Amino acid sequence: MNNYFIGKVLSGHHINNNGNGNTLSRTALTPTNNNVNRGDLVTNGLTPIDNNFIGSNGFIPRNVTRKDPFRKRTTQEFIREWTEWKEKSASLFTAPIVGVITSTLLEALKKLVAGRVLMSLTNLLFPNNSTSTMEEILRATEQYIQEQLDTVTWNRVSQELEGLKNDLRTFNDQIDDFLQNRVGISPLAIIDSINTMQQLFVNRLPQFQVSDDQVLLLPLFAQAVTLHLTFVRDIIINADEWNIPEAQLNTYKRYLKQYVAQYSNYALSTYEEAFRARFYPRNTVENMLEFKTFMTLNVLDLVSMWSLLKYVNLYVSTSANLYNIGDNKVNEGEYSISYWPFFNTYIQTKSNYVLSGVSGYAMRWSYTNPFFGEYIQDHLYNITASYIGGVNGPQIGQQLSTTELDQLVQQQARADIPVDFTQIPINCTLRNPLEVPYYATRFNELTSLGTAGVGGFVRSDVFISNDSVCGLGTNYSSGQTFYPDYYITNISATVQVNGTNTDISPLYFGENRAITSTNGVNKVIAIYNRKTNYDDFTNIRGTIVHEAPTDSTGFTISPLHLDTVNINSYLYIQENYGNNGDSLRVINRAIIKYRLSAARSVIYRLVLRVSGTASSIVAIYENYPVGSANQINTGTDNEGVIDNDSKFIDLIFNTPFSVSGTARELQLQVSGATTSSPLDIMNIILIPINDVPLY
């Protein structure tokens, strides 16, 4: 038999690879001679390694660059993009309609003019007067959870969907009749229609909260709640046009606040209970991230927007993270739920920087084994993310010195009979991180068949932008994981379990704590986020500079996207489930600065969503005080929503300020927070001066 690796055995640290050009696949076979059998077969001779290949990677989604984040989008665009995603990307059984609904609702929040969001959502969720789309959400959840409703419950839920569809259709028709004055309907009749629809919602929502099937029904519940809340919001926003009396209007404002809290608490507590139960006593990080991603897409993204429905004319630039994680199984390890807070902080510790590249070190070993024959084994030893401004994240895995490499070679030689090995440095750098970021990844572990049977594994850890495909094993698998309107904001990894105790205390914000393992990296992880409004000055400062919308729309800022803080160890990341991302926890007196830019002058008021206690918060814009709050205690004064023990209030600072120019400073000074009584900054909201929250 002919060897495909030529040269001196263990002759040195160099590439020595004569391959026949075939690519790897999961079902491939190994030829037993030098003849090329078929183009889809695995061979022991691999195609030359090129871990920074520039060129086309086949399918490219529609929205892969961050250009023009404020442009108006249409529902048809959302339908095309999410349908395309379902066909081309790993989808965790998620129905594309859930992404369409979220995108449509985000677009609706940006509009100042009155409108009928309920009618738009009704047409999307019940197209052609059918319940099939809502049933698709339920079936997808059953597939992912791997449980099914019993026949009786399924039939009851189907009947409720049919009833809800008919009720919505009747209500929308009645509003149409009133607005078009086709039948001379009086305002009193419209009020009757509104009150009837309100009662129908109140009666039907409990049918999606069946005690033994709460998790299965949660995505359906989230859609039904969104319909109810947008119904109430439409009434408030259109009160003048619909001739709604002031007393009735105040009632529905009270309803909006009441139902946001009631529905949010049910959804958040159901999710948290399911997350903890699913991973008790132990489970893999892969399962944790897949469950969180599924629930974010299907439930938590909507919950995050419910509490923002009281605002109009608002661009929501923040989002919870989505994930893609490798499927490697070697030395994977399982963790208890207590590991999660540590993990959630280390994958976000550089959240205020923009990802610019990935580096790492791998080796590809080839062996001759009496049982497997010749086979290949990949080993990824370490990986590090880099960011604009020359900033590096923590190194994850094992850093090999020359001595350690020589020892490793000898250790491998004792374990088997190596034919040769190849060093594979990974150096991926984005050409334009702001406008052309990584938007997709491909993480696979592929079986490398030996000449006498199953052998080792080869890895594909690939990062994809609009103009590059880079990483380990760029030629060995196809497919990609992406999400419409999301971009990759960080690359991280888990390490292979080797019995050593890891410090799993949560990282303070910005901490560079190396995550080590003598066995190296196990799974690479991509973190996706919806953030797009980066000002070009980010390239100069390194940290994020937030660009204000060009049409005087309000906008949100993630508290994690800060510029500087007086002492980093005073800040931590606090997980929230329904908050468009996590909070910034303050445990001591902190001075936190953010940077804003605007192409033209826009006058805003500042709203801070906070949870916890502090003696004071002072907000200063360009050395100009814009507001303060004293003796904050949201345990007794809050909006009724409980999100991972956070009870929040929106503090509105009424002093207006003009955002104009580049990299202007917004400073938050927090006093009186402690480790035992922290203050969480959950969201930073800038609303146009003349906009008033609905409640």
UniProtKB/Swiss-Prot annotation:
UniProt keyword list: Sporulation, Toxin, Virulence
Disulfide bond found in the keyword field: no
Pfam families: Endotoxin_C (PF03944), Endotoxin_mid (PF09131), Endotoxin_N (PF03945)
Keyword match Protein biosynthesis: no
Family membership noted in the UniProt record: Belongs to the delta endotoxin family.
The protein's role, per its UniProt record: Binds to the brush border membrane vesicles of scarab larvae and damages the gut wall somehow to allow the vegetative cells of P.popilliae to enter the hemolymph.
Protein name: Parasporal crystal protein Cry18Ca
Gene: cry18Ca
